[in-house]
Amino acid sequence: MPLSLLQELIKRPSITPQECGIYEIILNKLNSLIQKEHIDTFIIEQEKEGVKNLFYLIAPKGADKSNLHHFCFAGHIDVVPTGEGWEFEPFCGTQDEKYIYGRGTQDMKGGISAFICAVCNILESHNTSSLPIMLSILLTSDEEGEGIYGTKFMLEELKKRDLLPHSCIVAEPTSINHTGDMLKIGRRGSINGTLIIEGKQGHVAYPQKCINPIELLGSKLGALAGIELDNGDSHFAPSKLVITDIRSGMEVVNVTPQNLKIMFNVRNSPLSNEDSIRSYITSILGSLPYELTLKTNSLPFITADDSEIVKSLCAIIERTLGITPQLSTSGGTSDARFFASYGVNVVEIGVPNDRIHAINERVSISDILALHDIFVEFLQLFIKNAKIENLK
């Protein structure tokens, strides 16, 4: 059951990038169910710069793997620090009638427990001698941190070994009120920017001898701050320039500043990019003396809402839970972007996210069980469809 596995994982204080023996728990659970006469397994455990990653591949024994669809479950076992003021110990997995409490219950050990147990269900109940797909699990201990040596690094390794999946579910906590009410079928990109307006420092009593960068920018700030850079589309909200910091001067009243520095971020739709943002800012600033630096942290991506993975998940959720999931690209960046960069059809689905990174983080027992059941049904449907496809 996913509940007992979740409690076991919560008891491991895997604050980024610590792994705390979680992979051993998962490997033991999976390995105990592998029928070696029918199944080949391929395991990669890698550690780099303190980050530990696990890739576990299940494939039918002796099959031509180039002809099999490869589906992957992915997630991160690391959690953010707990802070103080918890009602329950954050690494105990306390359970009452409705909830399990602890750091990572929602983000995202709950999702991991659900898909690990779903895979175990398939291994226990399915005739693995006729498994028509490759099934894998990819886990990292560095998603909440810099993410350099986590999922991104592992996908680079998988590409070298020709083991990239064709489709993937990342079990991030995407839901709002109940498991399944929102799927993330894409994400906006993220572009950071720094703008420096150059001036000439001087005595405030002689403004004619100074060039005040604050005054230079003043009339133009309204065309930058909070401006929508495009109209968005049916899946993406408009790209918006959000100023996060403005600094100038020396905190004195008798010296005009030498320069003014603005830091900003754009969460961008596919309709905007570095070039279009630079062009827009240039058109606003005109001949002002300035220096602009832009850096793309992640690209926007979308998995088509008529793709098999999206249609299958929606159909299962509607049938089993009686709700129609909202297809969204909202929120921050996630490791799903790394899969998308390799052309993998990726969807994020998980438990609600109302308590992520918060004191007294908790997950509803019913939400965990619902997610587990969705994953089981998805795998069963995926296997059934693969068998039909193989018969054609």
UniProtKB/Swiss-Prot annotation:
EC primary class: hydrolase
Highest taxon, organism lineage: Bacteria
One Gene Ontology term from the biological process aspect of the record: lysine biosynthetic process via diaminopimelate
InterPro entries in alphabetical order: Bact_exopeptidase_dim_dom (IPR036264), DapE_proteobac (IPR005941), Peptidase_M20 (IPR002933), Peptidase_M20_dimer (IPR011650), Peptidase_M20A (IPR050072)
Cofactor(s) the protein needs: Zn(2+); Co(2+)
Enzyme active site: D78, E143 (proton acceptor)
Positions contributing to Zn(2+) 1 binding: H76, D107, E172
Recorded catalytic activity of this chain's protein: N-succinyl-(2S,6S)-2,6-diaminopimelate + H2O = (2S,6S)-2,6-diaminopimelate + succinate
GO terms of molecular function: acetylornithine deacetylase activity; metal ion binding; succinyl-diaminopimelate desuccinylase activity
Catalytic activity, EC: 3.5.1.18
Keywords: Amino-acid biosynthesis, Cobalt, Diaminopimelate biosynthesis, Hydrolase, Lysine biosynthesis, Metal-binding, Zinc
Subunit-level organization: Homodimer.
Its job: Catalyzes the hydrolysis of N-succinyl-L,L-diaminopimelic acid (SDAP), forming succinate and LL-2,6-diaminopimelate (DAP), an intermediate involved in the bacterial biosynthesis of lysine and meso-diaminopimelic acid, an essential component of bacterial cell walls.
Sequence similarity: Belongs to the peptidase M20A family. DapE subfamily.
Protein name in UniProt: Succinyl-diaminopimelate desuccinylase
Organism: Helicobacter hepaticus (strain ATCC 51449 / 3B1)
